[in-house]
Amino acid sequence: MTSPDLAFTVQVLSQFMHSPKNSHMEATLRVVRYIKGAPGLGLYMTAESTNNLTPYCDSDWGACLQTRRSVTGYLVKFGEALISWKSKKQDTVSRSSAEAEFRSMASTTAEIIWLTGVLKELDVEVQVPTQLMCDSKAAIQIAVNPIFHDITKHIDIDCHFVRERILQGMIRTNHVPTKE
């Protein structure tokens, strides 16, 4: 999938591949018409020399009406160039929007680690800490607060994973308003 603007739509439509209804086929044809009508659209890479990764993470809490599982979404920019993105249904049902957002943050953190490693292999130094942008103040508080409560016990592994990267100075969480 090389079109980030279609990532969420394709993720939703792929759930109905084995027994599609007419509405799913019509939606798929709309996607095909969109692609056919926009053949020149692509990713824009600038020649600037900034070596910073800027990841944004988000989730859609309980988005799947059948399972109530949330959808994780993220994108990562290197300078001004979009280099990675994902839209995927989470593996388990989240009991709160903060939990869904935090699972998205953990997934994005794993991607940051991988991308930093790839860039290092290419002899490209990345500025640290990476500024991880998130629209959930609750998820950010969970990430920076070393005290774990009953409400975070079931996402304990993700909490320690993200918190460890913060303490290592690899990432820093920043709030970005939902509207941006």
What are these model-predicted stretches?
Residues S3, D58, D135:
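Short, conserved phosphate/pyrophosphate- and ester-handling motifs at nucleotide-, phospho-/glycolipid
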